[in-house]
Amino acid sequence: MSACMSDPVHLSIDDGIALVTIDNPPVNVTSRAVREGLMAALEGAQAAGVGRVVLTGAGRTFVAGADAKEFSAPPQPPHLPDIVSRIETFPVPVVAAINGAALGGGLELALACAARIAALNATVGLPEVTLGVVPGAGGTQRLPRLIGLENALSLISEGKVIGAAEAEKIGLVDALADNPVEAARRYSWLERPATGALRGPVLNNAAIEAARKQVAKRSPNQIAPQKAIDLIEASCTLLLNDGLEQERAVFLELKSSDQAAALRHVFFAERAAMGQGKTGGADITSAVVVGGGTMGAGIAYALAGLGIDVALVETDETGAARARANIAKLYGEAVARGKSTPEKAEADQAARFRFHVGYDALPAADIAIEAVFEDIDVKRAVFTALDAALPETTILATNTSYLDVNRIAEVVRNPARFLGLHFFSPAHVMKLLEVIRADDTSPETLATALRLAGRMKKIPLLAGVCDGFIGNRILTRYRQTCDIMLIEGALPAQIDAALRGFGMAMGPYEVQDLSGLDIAYANRKRLGWKTKAGFRYIPIADRIVDETGRLGRKTNAGWYDYEGSKASPSALIDAIVIEESKRAGIERRAFSDEEIVARATTAMVEEGLRILEEGIAARSADIDLVMIYGYAFPRWRGGPMHWAGRVGLSEIERRIAEYAAKDPASWAVPNLLARAATEGKTPEDL
């Protein structure tokens, strides 16, 4: 007895055991068709009088949660909680054969089963809070009953995904097996209550309070993790059905919230970006990295971790020794984190790395990545040397943060194989990668770069050539807007506090102190901003560097004064700010936090719209990902462009027009915005 193989759920019966297989590629999400198929399969199994049901997934996934296509739509029957209840109350045991990832609704299905057998490489978790909701089919009520309060708090409120071995250790799965389906057919256990019939966990107020503090630190301003803790706490005292009713109400409330919409937007944007590296391009097996400093070493280490042989180039023996030390440090950190052993780390370094002084003896390589000082003449000299030393088929990539990629490409023989790869530091950790198309970059070169990004588990965002590309261009505009508010009446600590309140991880002046005031100072000198036509130059930051030598945390003084790691507002800096207002003939005025946030974020949006208008970015969602992953814009707000859509483009247009009336050198309504506001479009439509 079996269902049509084109159906997303198959039922087969052998020797009195029903095998129900969810087959909805690629990851067996619980779409409406799957839910209908599960109900039908259970009915068929019951009608056949089987003695056991084994529930599993086709391919390498059990069930990876809800169907993303249904996220924004009203729930359609049959609802997942009804299927979960049907499994839990089924007249014969249902055993979950967890053959791969069991996430979200997939784990909730497994929790309803009489037993859970997991493959050795299976993973389980309830990551719903990362999408702005809570589990909606019993996860917050059944999981604490099964594994205890503390374990459930950690898994659910943090959205953690754990491996099969850890799941068995905490009692989430009953056994591990090479073949979980066969093991589930034979598995025997003592009679025990269904998961939902177990007693609620013992209330532990200290554990709940600790979880709340941890969530507030890890996910500030986010609603879903705190709501999840509320529901887990309720599982200690409520009957199951009362807890399930409360959970479902919270789930449906959060599903329609702004935060859930923002996090869904980011989820889809990530999928679209990471999908770019899954087709086309060639595999990179060997690489040259020029520059063994923090950035270059991070890039080289990440490449070596993929099994790519790396030739690391420095200009002299001192630089080569520093590069070796930087690489050794990264491997040492991996050992300290338990990701490697001393023996393996030493063997990997010996197998993957060769260190070179100069370019004379470089091996042939599939790609060469430059990570040297941000000076166009230095970079052009590097690529002149690389072009002469390497085969004409080698892809050449610059890691510049701001510079004109087309000007650098002028020195190579075949500019079709040249592009920008803007990594973010530390390069082996940060997920963002801006992939810069030069005028002559070939589609094949782009495809290979995107394929490499996928192997590195980066989020690659395509960008055209302009100063700062997507992220640093918006950052520059954001900082300039904050500097203008300084000279008009705000102070650094107030601006930082207001933007942290909005959800930024750090304020702009805290960030500058962390990165070093000399970095932006050098960039302003390079661009000649003091005399740039049509640009409102604010000299405060340059005065701090020129007159005080304060460069930020590296000198224990910058925008703030420092005692160790503790920052405090600087009377000296505040005095310079106020003095600069007087020099400019500006009467200082009070700023509210709301005005600071509105101006700073609207500046990001205006610049983002110009980036779209000029074709530098292809999608507004790409801009959102750059700002979230590279510049700590709050994920739960969806990025600046998504945030603008929630505010409304008509309101953004009104604000910019108002700002432009007072400061036409800094503000103007982009043509793209004017059209979009008139036509009632959102940023996602542009």
Model-derived features with residue positions:
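Glycine-rich loop at the start of a catalytic domain that most often binds anionic cofactors/ligands
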Residues: 63-71
